[in-house]
Amino acid sequence: MFRKDEIAIKEWSLNQVQVCRKRQEMILECADRMLQPGGVMVYSTCTFAPEEDEDIIAWFLENHPDYMVEDWKEYLPDNCGLESGRTAFLCKEYDDSILRQIPNTLRLWPHKLSGEGHFAARLRKKGAITDIPDKKRQRKKAPKELADCLAFLNDSLIVSDQEDSASA
């Protein structure tokens, strides 16, 4: 909404881009901790700043080699106004294994489709998805565990009758 928001235009600066980049780094680090192996996250911005787009993806891949950028062009119609991310936009040099993945990201230009323009990357954490425990199965175990616990307490503890005789 940059073009339509005068405050955003006035607040824009190279320093603000770096502040936003740091924020994006923190968001991706948090997302990584929550994602299981085999899981997918979509990173998306509404900025054209390469520092928050291609470069943040390259930085993330460099720091998280257990991720890969998935190519999603096969899911998109031809000539839909989307373009691949550009390695020429990177702010520093990266390893070839990272450079090969940047074209799998997407740029959505406002002059090619309706909207303000965006950037997106589909990131998959390598590995197999592990089963999530079935909570219903866990609940079924609880009554038996409770019964075992009560049996242990009844066998192991002596209940005093003093309260009963004192109140009589």
PLM features: residue spans?
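Low-complexity, flexible helical/coil segments
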Residues: Q24-D32, L76-E83
